[in-house]
Amino acid sequence: MPILGKLFCGKHGAANWVDLAEAGRKEMLKKDIQPRPAYLKWAYIGMMTIAFWNGGLGLPWFTKYVLQVGVLGMALLFMLVTGDFRRLKTVGQFAVMFGLPFVMMAALSMLYWALDFQQLNYMSRGCSTILYHVISLSAMCSAVYLFGRRSIDYTLYGMCGANCCIVLGSIKENGIGAFVTGLIAFAKSGGIDTNAAIKALEVHDLTFAFGLMLLFALCCERGKKRLLYAALSGLFFFLGLKRIALIGLVGVFLMGEFIRRRKPKVQSILILLISIGAIVICFGYVYLIQSGLFNEIVHALEIDTMGRDRLYAAFQEVYDFSPAFRGYGIGYVTRYISIMTEAGVGVFGTHNFGGMHNDIVTMYIELGFWGFAFWIWYSWNGRIVWCQKEFGMQTALLLLYETIYGFITYATDNTVFYCYINTVFMLLPIAMAIGEQEQGEEKGKHERKEPETSKERRVVAS
């Protein structure tokens, strides 16, 4: 083991395994975190850059998940050769917290598939959808284990590197003149006027992820890092502008500023009120769409839903707003759309929608009334309250901000199972909780040392 330690970790070695043998697990867990070799950081940034730039290299779509498995392997190997388990408890707690909905989705889906005698290829597709997000969760837990709060920095660097590559690719294909002209028109029109060069920058999933990074920079970072990260995230968020993401970002920022200025007790009350209100709104939103009232409202107000109204109407016969509605399992909506599109039935014959562009209703259809109720409650109340009790108000508020932003995008898009937004969504609170813990431990060490230093000074003076 020491030989492996020297090969993989250089001077950092595998001394913790000796401590484990001599002092036991509890004493070992009290030791300082082992320093990480610099090349691990660069390896992670490189892997994330390729993962976020997946399509630009002409690589298979699943390459990003292969690289995320690589991050997991890198963390496991480092732990194996160093015996450093210090961050595992916190990382494990978050893994369970974020993993619980995936377990619920898999269990309910398997039950529904069995009752409906579904085909094996349909069931495997639903399971793979859940598995991909378990991989993303494992990768982000591994990144936080390796780098602590700095994992946010390194992930952002990878995202920026990927988007820079996308920008350079657009310039290469369309020319610098077309790019500059399109960028000026894009900025003047507020994201409405685009040419081919700017259209190439509209990377939906990555743009939503940059929105989360910008949200974190504005609400949680302080000092020079806040300005730098807000500038980087804001630039790429603007270039890939998604209007619903912008609405979500502005709404969360204003609400965050309001909550942040309140006292802790008031903050706890506000979290509870927001969660109750959000649960009611989500159920009300599903009812409006299923009953057809939503379409009546948007038609009366002459709002352009870009075809969503017709899509919602086509699904009205598929589900009911009732406690007796049990759902169809994960992946049903996209499969239904694919079958109807191939058959050219109704609105599906006019356009390939790809998804329902409303993941709140999609989750209701796939999980059923009670599965949806659990998902909504857990998202808005269960995990946020748990975070508050275990890791403090700041981590809980960050998770609340992310949830508000996420659900605003769910209302008009297919982001629940987007890879990049979920990767960043899971990363931020884990890294922040670890950062708060380690900062508190460091502060405690200094406080314990100060009395000893004062005593030594008194002895010298006497």
Language-model segments: residues:
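Long extracytoplasmic/lumenal interhelical loops at the membrane interface
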Residues: H299-L367
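Membrane-interfacial helix-loop-helix modules of multi-pass inner-membrane proteins that assemble, modify
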Residues: W113-Q119, R150, Y154, A162-H204, ...
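Aromatic-anchored transmembrane helix interface
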Residues: G70-V71, Q93-A107, F117-Y145, Y154-L156
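Alpha-helical transmembrane segments of multi-pass inner-membrane proteins
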Residues: I152-A178, K199-I259
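N-terminal signal-anchor transmembrane segment
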Residues: I3-C9, W17-D84, M104-W113, S170, ...
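Hydrophobic transmembrane alpha-helices and their immediate junctions
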Residues: D19-E22, S268, E366-F407, E436-E438
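A membrane-periplasm/extracellular boundary helix in multi-pass inner-membrane enzymes
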Residues: L168-K172, E257-L301
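Transmembrane alpha-helices of multi-pass inner-membrane enzymes
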Residues: W42, L399-S462
